[in-house]
Amino acid sequence: MKPHHTVLKVVSMVDAGCKYVIIGHSERRAMGETDADVNAKVLAALDAGLTPIMCCGETLEQRESGITTEWITMQIKLGLAGVPEDKIRKVIIAYEPIWAIGTGRTASPEQAEEVCESIRAAVRKLYSSKNARAISILYGGSMNDKNAFELLAQPDIDGGLIGGASLVPEKFVKIIEAANQPNE
C-alpha cells in the first residue's frame, strides 16, 4: 500500500469517529500485506491519534518447525520500527495463530501464554520492562465461550480479539463474562 493511501484512510477513519484500528490481520497478510505495510499503518495510526491493534502470528508449518518465537519476535520488531517510546503503550498487540483462525482449532492456554510471553519479552528488549508490563496483549485464535476463561487466566493474555464468536450474542456475552472473572 502506498503511504499516501494509508494517510487518507486513517484521516477518514478518524473523521468517522474510529478510535481503534486492526492492523496486520492474517486475512490482510494473506492478501500480500507486508511487515513494512504493517509498520507504516501502525505509525500512521499513532500519528492520527488512533490506537493500533497490531496482529502477529505463525502458520502451522512455522509452529511445527519450532520457529514460532523467532517469527513472532521478527514481526514485533518490524511492525514497531520507529514507534517512539512515549507512544508504545498506546499499541495493542494481538497474537493471532494463523493455524487457528476459522478452523475451530485453538492454541492451548499454555501455547498461547508461551507466545504472548515472548511478545512481552520482545517489547521489553525493544523498549523497557516498564513498557512491556504496560502494553496490552490480546489472544485472537478462535477464542470462544468454551475456552475464554482458561485463555484469559494466563498472565500475559490481557484480552481477546474475537472473531466469529462475536457474531452470536449469547456466546459473546459468555466471553465478556469470562473476561470479567477474577483470575486466581
Q: Which stretches of residues belong to each language-model region?
A:
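Active-site loop-to-helix "anion-binding N-cap" substructures in soluble metabolic enzymes
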Residues: 1-184
